[in-house]
Regions:
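Residue-level detector of conserved, function-critical positions
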Residues: 1-339
Length: 339
């Protein structure tokens, strides 16, 4: 597994440091993505090039869009069509498809001439394109739409769960999001609706996506949570809520922000002007216009001093002080600062 790298900014250019704050890739790019699975993208002449953790560019061809590597392959877009490259930058599946997803369990959803199926790593269809749209496999099942209705197919392309919903998403362990009449709920792997569609779609939210085993749910103007085992764990009652992390989730009550536990009980009283998700044991909070970090007991771990603060990731967090980027560690020590 590749050690984590963190994006830095210097004089308007982007590069990367390691967790000790040492520069690994010098700031030299006007645009750079985040590293995922050992690779990122940088923009060259208006198009994207792959770059590995050593700073090596794979420029056999530049692309309009590049997806993350999954099972050794990354989707890439040339003009309007998609194909795949391997971890050496070789184009192993030619850009022939109108749409593709990531490889999961040896197959990737792919659309060819308006119909969707599943391809193997050699680019050939394992499940012929007979569907209107398809999603990723998870433990042997994938969402697939046909004649306006969605169900779930196995790796032979046969429906394991009959088409019956207006939409469906990839299973996350035992639950998958399904939609009917503009609302979403959950079904299990037997096709039973464990949470009948009742929640509204909210722009900017990851509908039905589980974090720490819980997913945000919005109904009648209030936020609650559904659990990954297929139940409404916290009835919608909050003006605003954020994703779970470390067993706690941000909620807004009467204009102030605090945190609840998995049962919906207040664990940290609402007293902050703004707040974020718990990660690496700390969450960013805003008090008197400045950002700092608290621990799960609600105690200040890093005093509010920053103009902005991001969640911790792999032991570091990006903060802004006096308009400059800087990374701090879990003790609040600055390991790198923009000059």
């Amino acid at each position: 597994m590749q050690p984590p790298l963190f994006k830095i900014r210097q004089h308007g250019y982007f590069g990367f440091i390691n967790s000790e704050g040492k520069t690994v890739i010098e700031p030299q790019y006007l645009e750079a993505g985040e590293f995922r699975n050992g690779f990122t993208t940088v923009r060259l002449n208006g198009l994207l090039a792959l770059m590995d953790a050593l700073g090596r560019l794979y420029i056999k061809r530049l692309y309009r869009a590049v997806g993350p590597f999954s099972e050794g392959l990354a989707r890439v877009q040339v003009a309007q069509l998609w194909g795949f490259v391997d971890e050496r930058g070789n184009e192993v599946i030619a850009p022939l498809f109108e749409h593709v997803g990531d490889f999961c369990e040896g197959l990737a959803p792919a659309t060819f001439e308006g119909r969707a199926g599943f391809i193997r790593p050699d680019g050939q269809f394992s499940v012929q394109p007979v569907f209107s749209q398809t999603g990723n496999f998870s433990e042997g099942l994938a969402p697939a739409g046909h004649d306006g209705l969605w169900g779930f197919v196995d790796k032979t392309g046969a429906y394991h769960i009959a088409p019956q919903w207006d939409g469906a998403s990839t299973f996350q362990e035992q639950s998958a999001l399904v939609t009917r009449d503009g609302h979403w709920g959950l079904c299990n792997r037997a096709g039973e609706e464990t949470v009948p569609p009742q929640f509204e779609f909210v722009k900017g939210h990851a509908q039905g996506e589980f974090f720490d085993g819980m997913a945000l749910a919005f109904r009648a103007g209030k936020y609650g949570f559904v659990s990954q085992d297929g139940r409404v764990a916290v009835e919608p009652m909050f003006d605003l809520a954020g994703d779970f992390g470390g067993g706690l989730a941000l909620v807004e009550i009467n204009g102030a922000y605090g945190y609840i536990d998995r049962e919906g009980k207040l664990a940290i009283m609402p007293k902050f002007e703004d707040a974020g998700v718990f990660s690496d044991g700390l969450a960013q909070v805003c008090a008197d216009g400045r950002w700092g970090y608290i621990n799960p007991d609600g105690q200040i771990a890093i005093p509010p001093a920053f103009q902005s603060a991001a969640p911790f990731r792999d032991g570091l967090a990006l903060t802004v002080l006096d308009g400059k980027w800087q990374y701090i560690n879990l003790r609040g020590e600055v390991v790198w600062r923009e000059s």
